[in-house]
Amino acid sequence: GLPCGESCVYIPCISTVLGCSCSNKVCYRN
């Protein structure tokens, strides 16, 4: 549920390595 300061509209989340995932075009973690 915490925003990772990254969007995933055109490219995947780079922050997935930190546990972030794409949700509603924005990368979130928990």
From Swiss-Prot:
Biological function: Probably participates in a plant defense mechanism.
Positions bearing the Cyclopeptide (Gly-Asn) cross-link: G1-N30
Similarity comment: Belongs to the cyclotide family. Bracelet subfamily.
Disulfide bonds: C4-C20, C8-C22, C13-C27
Domain remarks: The presence of a 'disulfide through disulfide knot' structurally defines this protein as a knottin.
Tissues with expression: Detected in seeds (at protein level).
Processing after translation: This is a cyclic peptide.
Keywords per UniProt: Disulfide bond, Knottin, Plant defense
A Gene Ontology biological process term: defense response
Family matches, as InterPro entries: Cyclotide, Cyclotide_bracelet_CS, Cyclotide_sf
Protein name: Cyclotide hyen-F
